């Protein structure tokens, strides 16, 4: 609708940031989960042994990433209550059915390895365009219901992109890529509805770092990361604040400052583990590699913590993933002439006054 000859001049526009400030929309946060395939492969052997091979390692890793985001593990947010309602977007009806069928099994297997992680149960269902309006309505009503210590997830391919009235929806999860910017914006719009006690809507994007591959190498050539750039670019085209935040990253050198520049709307959570196999027990007890919060020092009891050198290795790997992701976000989603244009605009305004 940018064609003035067809649609005429814009009479009035309300920017996204202004709508949030006026309380018309809920603000959002994009959570990118970078999951280490090596860690998942090691931790999920019980699941792989007992399954029929329906899911591959990437699928399982994404599910674990989604679960950690839903319980807000490792997120820098004021409200630490786990999410209660989410919609997942898959690439097909078949993959959506598989996601809803296997997600709970994957989470159960993961929690059997890390029982201290959370007590939140996930319930899933699937909906698709072949279902009639009554059946779809029942599934949406199920999603709206209030539950205790339970997160309900309704999985679909495309039928929930628009026309979904669930204001209390906490998150949308992009399990697979989406080519259409319109589809992305409509899907994201599901979590921006206002609801009581709702401070943020979350956009969860799990990505996998294959075993033996560096994060920089994967970001350059792995097409599975395209969904990150697509979602951010779609949001950037509608939210002037995100556009500014992404371009601020380019101005600072320190990784901490880069993270703070975008953390209000984008958070990168790296679930990585580079400890050797013989250090697994130490890792589990220290909470490292799992997103855990334990920081127990070795004392009179038998509690063990991984050696400092190994902790430094984990921290370095975590920073490497974040730094690589931030650099690629600026490259893929930033505006190369942003600050030049900004300077020109300021100069023009100053000259007018």
PLM feature spans:
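"Short basic amphipathic alpha-helical interaction patches in structured regions
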Residues: 46-48, 101-104, 187-188
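Conserved C-terminal RecA-like helicase domain
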Residues: 54-156, 178
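Long, largely alpha-helical accessory region at the distal end of helicase-like NTP-driven motors
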Residues: 58-78, 214-351
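Short glycine-/polar-rich loops that comprise or flank the Walker A/P-loop
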Residues: 7-9, 25-29, 120-123, 167-171, ...
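Conserved RecA-like P-loop NTPase helicase motor core
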Residues: 127-248
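Conserved interdomain linker/interface between the two RecA-like ATPase lobes of SF2 helicase motors
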Residues: 8-94
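Intrinsically disordered, low-complexity acidic/polar segments
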Residues: 39-42, 97, 212-214, 242
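Short regulatory helix/loop adjacent to the ATP-binding pocket of P-loop NTPases
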Residues: 1-6
């Amino acid at each position: 609708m940018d064609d003035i000859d067809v649609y005429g001049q814009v009479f009035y526009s309300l920017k996204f940031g202004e709508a949030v400030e006026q309380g018309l929309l809920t603000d959002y946060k994009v959570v990118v989960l970078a999951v280490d395939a090596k860690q998942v492969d090691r931790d999920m052997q019980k699941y792989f042994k007992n399954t029929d091979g329906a899911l591959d390692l990437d699928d399982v890793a994404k599910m674990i990433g989604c679960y950690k985001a839903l319980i807000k593990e490792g997120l820098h947010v004021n409200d630490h209550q786990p999410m209660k309602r989410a919609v997942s977007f898959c690439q097909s009806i078949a993959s959506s059915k598989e996601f809803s069928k296997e997600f709970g099994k994957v989470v159960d297997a993961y929690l059997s390895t890390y029982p201290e992680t959370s007590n939140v149960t996930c319930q899933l269902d699937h909906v698709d365009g072949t279902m009639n309006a009554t059946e779809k309505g029942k599934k949406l009503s199920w999603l709206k219901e209030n539950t205790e210590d339970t997160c309900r997830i309704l999985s679909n391919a495309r039928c929930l992109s628009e026309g979904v009235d669930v204001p209390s929806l906490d998150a949308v999860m992009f399990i697979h890529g989406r080519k259409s910017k319109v589809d992305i914006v409509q899907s994201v719009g599901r979590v921006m509805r206002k609801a009581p006690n709702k401070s943020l809507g979350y956009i969860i994007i799990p990505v996998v770092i294959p075993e033996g591959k560096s994060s920089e190498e994967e970001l350059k050539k792995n097409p599975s990361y395209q969904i990150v750039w697509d979602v951010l670019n779609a949001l950037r085209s509608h939210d002037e604040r995100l556009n500014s935040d992404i371009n601020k990253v380019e101005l600072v050198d320190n990784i901490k400052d880069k993270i703070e520049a975008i953390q209000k709307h984008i958070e990168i959570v790296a679930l990585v583990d580079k400890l050797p196999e013989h250090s697994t027990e130490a890792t589990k007890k220290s909470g490292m590699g799992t997103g855990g919060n334990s920081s127990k020092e070795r004392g009179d009891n038998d509690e063990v913590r991984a050696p400092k050198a190994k902790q430094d290795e984990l921290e370095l790997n975590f920073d490497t993933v974040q730094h690589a992701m931030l650099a690629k976000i600026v490259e893929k989603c930033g505006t190369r002439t942003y600050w030049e244009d900004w300077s020109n605009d300021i100069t023009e305004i100053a000259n007018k006054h």
